[in-house]
């Protein structure tokens, strides 16, 4: 049941709005006056059709068939056939969060009034999201130009009573899914099928879901990095604000400040401030602000690109009702999304890479000064030995997944669409990387708290003790070997819930995507 609401003023969604939509399901309604604007635009399209002017996708074929003129009597069939023929995706269906966001983003773009669709189309998109009619959209089949055609065709198929949708956990034919919640299919008018299919909403939604999940994993990795620093009895000297001010990198400065806040009153840190023969810590401890700060800056840049795209008109042709014009362009080309997703992939992979190195340090008795593999009676017990191997496997997998997708292109539609972005895959695989890094950070979380337990009675800082206590409420100390996977899953769930839930006292100082 909906417990909150969002009024959609087209083109004005904020990162906070999008984050909220990614993690919850507010009821969305159009702002006042938007339906009148859409109705005026639809009447303009009718005038263009009546004038008999050839307009791509309105009274012509599509792609390589753009020069084929379509008779007025066939214009509605043209739009329906477009949807059916383009619903050619394959693979597992996208998750509910992504599909709900696709519906909202498509409504947001169409509602700006430059696509020539009737208000009924936008109303139905929003009501499908509000009432939980979520089209079954296969993950694979889009090259990110001309828009996300196949995914959006599967979305649109449900609007016209075809395709399939999930409703209350059941998969139903499109018309039955709509009627199950009191909605009815629509018949598409001129331009409407093309407007629904053309656009970057699928790749943008995939990227946004991955981005907001990455934000939570990033914040958790800051906490686990501080836990590891204390468990390994590292020095806080490299976090001195003077060092970071001299470099001037914004993300680095913010991350260093958070590490200082997390470790401020640690008795462990104070215990080895004097008479410690170690001059410098390994890079995975010492260079955390530099690495994590660069990742933060990269994620923020990606967020700024995706925010623009979430509010964009990425249709083609684009309609200008005030002059009854249709202009063919290339706003459907998802290159901005693809490059932003590639940057996210690199940044999130690096968060996992340095976390895995910190974990490797903890299990190495010579590096950490802790029991081998963080368990008593090592030899009889293997402790964290294979958990670290799992983290290494995930980090190595990410190296391949982080290869840029945007630098690849294959021509389609008989070379009419001869350069494509690969944005949909670029965005989808970021989700895979985020999932891998969440597990790496979860294993580090387990290891760091285990390491801190060995340092008792010395206590870590209050914030870090809170993080350790939250884990220990679900996962007991490793006094002997046991099956590890359930513990990793428990730590992963804590991370997925978000650090503000884990440590409400530091929520205000956590770096976020907003600059």
From Swiss-Prot:
Pathway terms, separated by semicolons: Amino-acid degradation; L-histidine degradation into L-glutamate; N-formimidoyl-L-glutamate from L-histidine: step 1/3
Gene Ontology molecular functions: histidine ammonia-lyase activity
Any Pfam family the entry gives: Lyase_aromatic
InterPro entries: Aromatic_Lyase (IPR001106), Fumarase/histidase_N (IPR024083), HutH (IPR005921), L-Aspartase-like (IPR008948), Phe/His_NH3-lyase_AS (IPR022313)
5-imidazolinone (Ala-Gly) crosslink location in chain: 145-147
Enzyme class: lyase
Gene3D superfamilies found in the cross-reference section: Fumarase/aspartase (Central domain) (1.20.200.10), Fumarase/aspartase (N-terminal domain) (1.10.275.10)
Modified residues (2,3-didehydroalanine (Ser)): 146
Keywords of the record: Cytoplasm, Histidine metabolism, Lyase
Annotated compartments: Cytoplasm
Main location: cytoplasm
EC number: 4.3.1.3
GO cellular component assignments: cytoplasm
Record flagged with keyword Cytoplasm: yes
Catalytic activity: L-histidine = trans-urocanate + NH4(+)
Origin: domain of life: Bacteria
Free-text description of this protein's post-translational modifications in UniProt: Contains an active site 4-methylidene-imidazol-5-one (MIO), which is formed autocatalytically by cyclization and dehydration of residues Ala-Ser-Gly.
Biological processes, Gene Ontology terms: L-histidine catabolic process to glutamate and formamide; L-histidine catabolic process to glutamate and formate
Family the entry assigns: Belongs to the PAL/histidase family.
PANTHER family the record matches: HISTIDINE AMMONIA-LYASE
HAMAP family the UniProt entry points to: His_ammonia_lyase (MF_00229)
Name of the protein this chain belongs to: Histidine ammonia-lyase
Gene name of the record: hutH
